[in-house]
Amino acid sequence: MGGTRDALRQAYVGEAKAALRLKVFAQKAEEEGYPQMAKLFRVIAWSEEIHGARALRVLKEIKTTEENLAESFQSEQGVAEVAYNQFVKEAEADGDQAAVLHFSQSRDVEETHAKLYKEAMNHLMEERETTYHVCQVCGYIADGPPPENCPVCGIGKEKFKAFR
């Protein structure tokens, strides 16, 4: 290990971070009335995603769907149970209530991600069709119709986006 493989992993992480940051920048540009700047941020974000995906392919880290589901489940479960709980404790110790809210809601959403992966692993062969609804405030995912209010952040169902 080392050398090239580490460089590929670093490239993947860097590209993923850049893509997300640019998507958020695009949202801000839209809010401020700069649609062409938003488009530029989005197109570069897409390009960064391509770079990150290529690094994953070179690393041979894209496996079968069943293996990808199992890995994703383990990752989400670990993040929810370990990382976010530690982040909450640190934010509480620092007295940063905005960070406490962010970390605790993110932890709760990560737990729902793990449940969705677990359910998908149990029903892989069925390949059932569903519409997911994602809370645009905290990221909670409803499997089916959106709830009247998000169970994590409390926002109304009008803030949910459908994914068909």
Predicted regions and their residues:
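Non-heme di-metal
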Residues: 1-164
